[in-house]
Amino acid sequence: QSQPVIDTSMMTAPSKDITEFHEKFAKLVDNVSQVVVGKEAPIRQCATAMVVGGHILLEDNPGTGKTQLARGLANSIDMSFKRIQFTPDLLPSDVVGITFYDQKHGEFEFREGPVFASIVLADEINRASPKTQSALLEVMEEQKVTVDGVTHDVPQPFIVIATQNPIEQLGTYKLPEAQMDRFLIKTSVGYPGHQVSVDLLRQVNIRDRAQTVSPVLAGDDILALRGIGERIHIDDNILEYIVRIVEATRHDENIAIGSSMRGALALTRCARIWAASDGRGYVVPDDVKDLAVAVLSHRIKLTAEATFAGLTTDETISRMLETVPVPSLGA
């Protein structure tokens, strides 16, 4: 079957903006790589989400370096950073803040919660009660907090990096599917390779690697990179390819609930940044493929049969990508 051809003559040439983007993005990834060694793919995915301005969900087993990765990212960018350790008894007011009566001045005052920072690390988000989870997830969507009828804006840029252990662990509350959709990407760190593990053990004097990195970018740099990313050319054939992938999630026999348009929009925004981070002014199909699992796997729900058969959402998306026809690059 003949596949649509992408007209490369329409593509934007790499300008000084794209060169600047490539250099700054690489600097950020290299800096975080000092904290989480040998994990370039998840670091690039997280950095992409930060530039887009989306939220990140890191899901992996205990001790794989989720919090280290999150703190490494936060410490690499000169922006306000707060960490919330989620526990079953944490209240929504502990996250967003409270209004209290100031007896000295005789008036009500608002005391900001830890969510008022540019980068918020929500550690072990699935250990908190659904009510507290909802409080954070509302801020993620609305970018503002309403307490006692008064609305307070959070700082910009505003990015939540949440970590969670897989559901098999005891004492956890599963994030609802609708709220999972609020995260731009979901990725995992995985255990380090053999040689990296040996090298880590050799460095006996470093207790906390995230503390050793210093900022290489400012908050304004992130906003500037976001502006460049929005000008990256994306061909209609690539847009159709993205829509075909998302539509395929709705017709797959193993998937009970497919991805919404939010997934297609997220994939488009991420692909632009991924292309620019590669030093290109245009998106190619591989950009979409590299990101599809991280962007879409948490937006779908498998059928009971597929789950019982041991399939994972990541495997399902990967296998599905092989069946969707890829547009070829024309000369």
List each language-model region with its residue ranges:
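AAA+/SF3 P-loop NTPase mechanochemical coupling elements
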Residues: 109-118, 147-164, 175-185, 262
